[in-house]
């Protein structure tokens, strides 16, 4: 059997049982408590018939409970399926059947999204759930045999007797979720051994230590935020998240707990730097700032390196690959943070449309090899064959869809994305999914969604709308209409009413929409 995550958890639970593994606000989970709680919940899952390769849905925000549910599923050989807790009923109606989840763990709500209501709105015959376990007050849980409180679930079915599953190297650890170009879910089969290997390698590169405390801005339910935290846990350190990002408490937490590693996106950094009295916070304990998820402007990197004296490590990664390439101020300071090099445990190619390597100075698609490249898109063999290539050595390469310039010295410069994806803050928004929801609005005849630059969130969502007749549509009206259907961050930031959506051979001509004289 291959090495597994639980080997590390069990080791640290024995060596440092009372050490805090995870802290979210004032809630703490020690290494010993982690082993105890995953045993109880894992045994409860087994008691209701969940076992090897069964899928366990999780629709919850950052919390101790989220972490315990995830690893309880892994402990018994089942596969956790983290879902964005901002997901509405339309998204969940596609996502849950696609995952084949038998049981789902939820909280009452997250932000303005009522998760219990979203699940309850689904037609039972259209989803696969046999049981919904709720971390909520009993009076909020539907009076239905399918629903049960988490407290009752563990009391009735749980015990302290739960063996740890022994996975093969390629056994699927979890299904990571992301939307496809039409909003149809893409489900990523994350390999257990490969994911462990890449997280260990990255933790070694960053020189993480057992006495480190890491504060993450990204969420647990995003593969990046989860994986970066695991890099620290594998060293026996402490990881910290917030239920929701708050710049003041983020800075106060760094100061209070002497945080040594902070994980940020460019958007979060802009918010932090604009916090009143930012200079009064003591950040002297921070030795590394770890960046992912968005383009990192040189101006922001320079503030952290030169003004704050903090090492900047910027990575391009994806849910399909884990870490891919890196820019590290300890080595690359003075160059653009969008100029990346491969790591010792990764490999890259830059190819043209015929899958041939391009020459230096040319632009092509980035191909990446790591041990952590997904084994497949679950339930989608066509997409798997298109995006995952296997070489003569049996190594899996991922076609990222990222466009890069191939520069001398093995450097690749990020140039953009080949897909119609809007990077709004730390979230990926597929324009086609927003268009599809807009077209269900009774006042809208046609719609086209694109992006435009935004000084804080990077890109904002722009919806060009052709109303029916003399109807008027406002952003506020769309926000109310989207509520409960799609995640709140998918609501268009800007609405432009037009007389007609210009098309050519059925395709929207965005270049005309963007011209001011057309609006």
Regions found by a protein language model. Give the residues of each.
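Conserved AMP-binding/adenylate-forming core of the ANL superfamily
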Residues: 2, 18-63, 67-71, 88-93, ...
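Conserved pre-ATP/AMP-binding loop-to-beta segment of ANL
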Residues: 17-18, 133-134, 152-177, 184, ...
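Conserved AMP-binding A3 loop
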Residues: 30-32, 173-197
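AMP-binding/adenylate-forming catalytic core of the ANL superfamily
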Residues: 87-97, 104-106, 262, 370, ...
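Gly/Ser/Thr-rich phosphate-binding loop
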Residues: 151, 234, 259-264, 273-335, ...
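Conserved AMP-binding/adenylation subdomain of ANL enzymes
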Residues: 196-213, 221-261, 275
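Conserved ANL (AMP-binding/adenylate-forming) active-site segment centered on the GW(Y/F)…HTG consensus within
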Residues: 309, 373-401, 418, 435, ...
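Conserved ATP/PPi-binding loop(s) of AMP-dependent carboxylate-activating enzymes
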Residues: 342-345, 356-389, 427-429
């Amino acid at each position: 059997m291959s090495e597994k995550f639980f080997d590390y958890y069990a080791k640290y639970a024995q060596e440092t049982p009372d050490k805090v593994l995870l802290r979210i606000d004032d809630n703490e989970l020690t290494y010993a408590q982690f082993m105890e709680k995953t045993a109880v919940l894992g045994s409860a899952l087994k008691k209701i018939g969940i076992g090897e390769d069964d899928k366990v849905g999780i629709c919850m925000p950052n919390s101790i409970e989220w972490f315990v549910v995830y690893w309880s599923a892994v402990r018994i050989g089942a596969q956790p399926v983290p879902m964005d807790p901002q997901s509405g009923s339309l998204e969940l109606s596609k996502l849950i059947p696609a995952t084949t989840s038998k049981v789902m763990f939820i909280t009452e709500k997250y932000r303005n999204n009522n998760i219990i209501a979203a699940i309850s709105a689904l037609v039972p015959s259209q989803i696969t759930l046999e049981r919904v376990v709720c971390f909520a007050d009993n009076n909020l849980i539907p009076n239905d045999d399918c629903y049960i409180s988490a407290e009752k679930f563990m009391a009735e079915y749980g015990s302290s007797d739960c063996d740890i599953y022994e996975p093969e190297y390629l056994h699927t650890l979890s299904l990571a979720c992301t939307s496809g170009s039409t909003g149809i879910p893409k489900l990523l089969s994350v390999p257990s051994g490969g994911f462990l290997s890449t997280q260990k390698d990255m933790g070694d590169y960053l020189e993480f230590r057992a006495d480190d405390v890491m504060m993450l801005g990204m969420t647990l339910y995003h593969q990046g935020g989860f994986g970066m935290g695991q890099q620290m846990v594998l060293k026996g350190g402490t990881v910290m998240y917030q239920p929701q990002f708050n710049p003041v408490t983020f800075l106060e937490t760094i100061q209070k707990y002497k945080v040594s590693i902070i994980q940020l996106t460019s958007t979060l950094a802009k918010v932090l730097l604009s916090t009143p009295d930012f200079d009064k916070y003591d950040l002297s304990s921070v030795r590394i700032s770890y960046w992912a998820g968005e383009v990192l402007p040189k101006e922001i990197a320079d503030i952290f390196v030169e003004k704050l004296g903090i090492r900047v490590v910027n990575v391009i990664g994806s849910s399909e690959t884990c870490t891919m390439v890196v820019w590290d101020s300890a080595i690359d300071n003075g160059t653009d943070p969008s100029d990346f090099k491969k790591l010792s445990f990764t490999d890259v190619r830059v190819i043209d449309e015929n899958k041939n390597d391009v020459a230096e100075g040319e632009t092509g698609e980035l191909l990446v090899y790591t041990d952590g490249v997904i084994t497949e898109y679950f339930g989608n063999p066509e997409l798997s064959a298109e995006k995952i290539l296997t070489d003569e050595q049996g190594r899996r390469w991922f076609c990222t869809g990222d466009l890069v310039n191939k520069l001398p010295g093995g450097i690749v410069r990020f140039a953009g994305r080949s897909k119609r994806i809007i990077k709004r803050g730390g979230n990926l928004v597929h324009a086609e999914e927003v268009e599809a929801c807009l077209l269900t609005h009774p006042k809208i005849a046609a719609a086209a969604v694109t992006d435009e630059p935004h000084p804080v969130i990077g890109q904002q969502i722009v919806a060009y709308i052709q109303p029916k007749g003399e109807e008027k549509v406002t952003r506020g009206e769309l926000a109310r209409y989207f509520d409960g259907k799609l995640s709140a961050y998918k609501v268009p930031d800007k609405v432009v009413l037009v007389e007609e959506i210009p098309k050519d051979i059925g395709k929207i001509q965005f270049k005309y929409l963007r011209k001011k004289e057309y609006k």
